[in-house]
């Protein structure tokens, strides 16, 4: 039997999310990349949480580091891609309203694109 690689879903980086991720410490970036690879392969991230208050299908990958908590917010409900909506360093127990607004505005762009394709 041939050992086949899984077909990976495309990652679509919204806004500045890729540049924001690149600002994370190296080991956090590496862990985020591995967790995104798991999503691309059809698996769940190791530590994730649904974020229904931000939109249907929005989820976050939770990354911990001695320098703080980091988040990768994504949408994986569409077959063509995993949309990375936002990446940020979480500084308080609750997600800041500013971070939520960024996610909502980028999610609206995706929703409008999907409506126009129907």
Show the residue positions of the predicted features.
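Conserved catalytic cores of phosphodiester-cleaving nucleases, focusing on short active-site segments
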Residues: 85
């Amino acid at each position: 039997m041939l050992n086949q690689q899984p077909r990976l879903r495309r990652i679509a980086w919204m806004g500045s999310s890729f540049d924001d991720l690149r600002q994370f410490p190296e080991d956090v970036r590496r862990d985020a990349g591995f967790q995104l690879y798991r999503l691309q392969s059809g698996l769940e991230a190791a530590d994730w949480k649904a974020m229904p208050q931000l939109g249907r299908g929005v989820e976050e990958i939770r990354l911990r580091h001695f320098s703080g908590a980091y988040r990768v917010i994504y949408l994986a409900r569409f077959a063509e891609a995993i949309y990375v909506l936002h990446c940020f360093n979480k500084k308080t127990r609750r997600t800041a309203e500013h971070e939520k607004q960024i996610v909502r505005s980028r999610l609206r762009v995706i929703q409008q694109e999907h409506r126009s394709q129907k």
